[in-house]
Every structure is written in structure tokens, then in C-alpha cells.
Amino acid sequence: MIEVLLVTICLAVFPYQGSSIILESGNVNDYEVVYPRKVTALPKGAVQPKYEDAMQYELKVNGEPVVLHLEKNKELFSKDYSETHYSPDGRKITTNPSVEDHCYYRGRIENDADSTASISACNGLKGHFKLQGEMYLIEPLVLSDSEAHAVFKLENVEKEDGGPKMCGVTQNWESYEPIKKASDLNFNSDQQRFAKRYVELVIVADHRMFMKYKSDLFSICSRVHDIVNFINWFYRSLNIRVSLTDLGIWSDQDYITVQSSAENTLHSFGEWGKSVLLKQKRHDNAQLLTAIVLDEDTLGLAYLSSMCNPWTSVEIIQDHSPINLLMGVTMAHELGHNLGMKHDEKDCLRGATLCIMRPGLTPGRSYEFSDDSMGYYQSFLDQYKPQCILNKPLRIDPVSTPVSGNELLEAGEE
């Protein structure tokens, strides 16, 4: 008989609720401090991995007990994931960190069918969970007791001053192809709506990002991993797995001219991606994450219906918010344009959920792709038949013959 060991981390709600606090996510009004309790069932004598494949936490939200079930996101990284930065003298340094035992999870709340969760457990619990239609953020508190966490609603994060923040894609960038509404698509009731597809993603952080995060490579990597975990979650409704295959950090200088004109920077990044990046790393899509302030309150820009094109399967995104969830929404939005999605109406809702493809970013309860976005995506698949997103990310043997089939020319291919 297997003996079950319960590993318990003190469960309690801190004896007060705070009215205001400064957290990594910004200035937060109305939060509560909780101590999550981790419950792990292990056979007697078993060696506990640092990050288990499945975990369960108990905590109290608004005074009510909540059980959070988490499962490791095993599709977050490609198996040949790499990280690249540069020495002060311009020497390129590429490493292949082990990602088998990573700390990024997705999950749900027990007894809440509409719940979701996207959590990093690298240093405490950090991320979001959707409970009874409300979006909550959780992050560790820097207190004498290391197990204390803040839980707060996204709507309680103070909004930044200034006008609405917008995507830079306009009608001038869009084609006028007829689309199929999601409700009109012929889906086999015994099959999923969309066949499973895979996007191998490269993210490049520019030199301003490196300086913004005080030359701390680890901080940039951790932030990007958190964000991609959110992106991966959003795209599950389309049966798309977004896997990070390389994270590049321009630690010594910018390798294109990064300017406040989003259109010019996007054009330059696309040229660099085709002439340089594509020869360095197999990928389907590349995003430039920049700390420059883009003109006209623009948060990002992308080409429409360009996935698998070696020059235009790119986006640029401004690092506009300390909240990883909101950065994930923006980056998922711009990627959506590459996958054929046009903008929703500015007040688009899917039930009580905000539509990801709204033209402007609005902090809300939660985010999903609309039926129209799904229709645009299906039309893109039908018209363009993108091949690069059909292949599942696999480990690449650097001495093996390059494998084709992704519409992007690999080094060594004809």
C-alpha cells in the first residue's frame, strides 16, 4: 500500500485586507494577502522533483476556499530552445538551457467549469486565475514571511495616465477577403473545431529592453517566459500551440534601427529576420519586444495574413505594462493579425469576456478570441494553406540534414 505524504505550506488568510500597495504589477487598490497551501501526494521514499508535472494549491479568495489545479505546460518551449545574447565586444553567446523541469503551469479552479489559470511557480505563485467570471492576479509579497501572496482583481490595478492604447494595424494594412463566420463553418461534432497546429516563436528583446531591466538577463528571460505562457493559453481555443524556440537579447546594441515609427521598425525587423535570424534559428514567427515608446499611443504592429512568409511573419510590441497578462494579450493580438485576424469592434464582448482582437487594450475580467476571429483564422487557413505551422516542434540535431516543410528556407536547404 502506498503511503501518501502531504506536503503542506501553512494555509491562512492574512489577518487584514490592504487598501493600496505597490507590486510588480503596479499600484494596486484593494487586495488581500493569502498563504497558499500546496498539497502533494507522493509515494513513500519518492524523490520529489523540483517542479512536479501536476500540483494542487488551496487558498482563500474573498474568504471562500479555492482549490487550484495546475498542470505543467509541456508545450511552452521547443525541445531545442535556445537563448542568445551578446558580450560587450559584440561576440554572440548562445546557450541551450534545460527546459524539461521548468516552472510554468496552466490550470483551473475546482468546481468552476469556466475557470482558467496561467501560473509560474518559479518563486512562489505568480500569474492569473479566472474565478466565477472574475480575473484575479496573484504574486508573491516581499515580506518577512516568504509564503505571503497578494491576490487582487485586474480591475483594481491603477490605470496609467494618457489616452487609449491602440494596435497600429488599420484598414490600410488589411485585405478585403470575405470571411467565414465561425457559426457558418462545417465542423464535425466528433472532432475539434480546428486541427492542431504549432507556431515556433522567436522573441527578440531590443537594447532598450536590456537597459530598462538594468542589464539583468535573468529578469528579461523570466518575464518573457511568463508572457509566452499566457500567449500559449489564449491560443488553446484555436488548437494552436505556441512554443518559444529562441529568446534573443540585444545586450550590446540594436541590430536594426529601432525608432518610434512602428511601421518603419516593423519593416526593418522583417528584413533582419529574413536575412539574419532565419539563418540562425528555425522558426515560424518572430516578435520584437521593444522599450521604445511608439508613436500615436501604438502598442504593436503586424502584417496581416503573413504567417510562414520569411519576411513578414513578424510583429513588434512595445513593453507597455508591468502586468504580464496584458503583455500577453497584446502579443497574442499581434500574432492574430499574422494568422489572418482583423480587428473586432472596439466594444466586442464574448459573453462577459473581452475580445482579444479589439483595436485597443482594455483591462477587463478575462480575454478570448471572438467568433469572428475564429472565422478569419479559418479563412486564412483555407486561402493561404500555411505549411510551417503543421510540423510539431522537435529537437533539432545540429549535424543532421536540415528538414524542410515549413515554407521558410532553413540553413542548408535548397
Curated annotation (Swiss-Prot):
Manner of cofactor binding, per the entry note: Binds 1 zinc ion per subunit.
Origin: domain of life: Eukaryota
A Pfam family the protein falls into: Pep_M12B_propep
Propeptide: 21-190, 394-414
GO biological process assignments: proteolysis
Modified residues (Pyrrolidone carboxylic acid): 191
Keyword field contains RNA-binding: no
Residues bound to Ca(2+): 200, 284, 388, 391
Gene3D superfamilies: Collagenase (Catalytic Domain)
Tissue-specific expression: Expressed by the venom gland.
Molecular functions (GO terms): metal ion binding; metalloendopeptidase activity; toxin activity
This protein's UniProt keywords: Calcium, Disulfide bond, Hemostasis impairing toxin, Hydrolase, Metal-binding, Metalloprotease, Protease, Pyrrolidone carboxylic acid, Secreted, Signal, Toxin, Zinc, Zymogen
Signal peptide per UniProt: 1-20
Subunit structure of this chain's protein: Monomer.
PANTHER family: ADAM A DISINTEGRIN AND METALLOPROTEASE DOMAIN (PTHR11905), DISINTEGRIN AND METALLOPROTEINASE DOMAIN-CONTAINING PROTEIN 28 (PTHR11905:SF32)
Family note: Belongs to the venom metalloproteinase (M12B) family. P-I subfamily.
Task performed by this protein: Snake venom metalloproteinase that impairs hemostasis in the envenomed animal.
Protein name: Snake venom metalloproteinase
Source species taxonomy: Eukaryota, Metazoa, Chordata, Craniata, Vertebrata
